[in-house]
Amino acid sequence: MSSGGLLLLLGLLTLWAELTPVSGQDHPKFCYLPADPGRCKAHIPRFYYDSASNKCNKFIYGGCPGNANNFKTWDECRQTCGASAMGRPT
């Protein structure tokens, strides 16, 4: 293979590595915790990552203490835990 062909192959492999989604093993451990509304009685809409479906879902947070699988926005949840962009809640 010529040096130009090798360079092209290297470039394509590098691009593929950059565009390939992060594997589940690279998610923060708290992404695998269940949704936890906490023991308080507030009614705060939040999102949690559901590792079984690879989606961020809505839940109602009570305000304290809960766990770290608790995000103010769907985008924050998806970016942190690597959820699928499909099935965005309305």
UniProtKB/Swiss-Prot annotation:
Disulfide bond entries: 31-81, 40-64, 56-77
Cited function: Serine protease inhibitor that principally inhibits trypsin (Ki=0.34 nM). Also inhibits alpha-chymotrypsin (Ki=270 nM), plasmin, plasma and pancreatic kallikrein.
SMART domains: KU
Annotated protein name in UniProt: Kunitz-type serine protease inhibitor 1
Localization, UniProt: Secreted
Keyword Transport recorded: no
Tissues and organs where the protein is expressed, per its UniProt entry: Expressed by the venom gland.
Residue numbers marked as site, Reactive bond for trypsin: 41-42
SUPFAM superfamilies with a match to the protein in the record: BPTI-like
GO molecular function (one): serine-type endopeptidase inhibitor activity
Keyword annotations from UniProtKB, A to Z: Disulfide bond, Protease inhibitor, Pyrrolidone carboxylic acid, Secreted, Serine protease inhibitor, Signal
Main location: secreted
Boundaries of every BPTI/Kunitz inhibitor domain copy: 31-81
Family in the record: Belongs to the venom Kunitz-type family.
InterPro entries assigned: Kunitz_BPTI (IPR002223), Kunitz_BPTI_sf (IPR036880), Prtase_inh_Kunz-CS (IPR020901), TFPI/VKTCI-like (IPR050098)
Species assigned in the record: Vipera ammodytes ammodytes (Western sand viper)
Gene3D superfamilies assigned to the protein according to its UniProt record, in alphabetical order: Pancreatic trypsin inhibitor Kunitz domain (4.10.410.10)
Modified residues (Pyrrolidone carboxylic acid): 25
Leader sequence segment: 1-24
Top-level taxon of origin: Eukaryota
Propeptide: 86-90
One cellular component (GO) term of this entry: extracellular space
Annotated TM spans: none
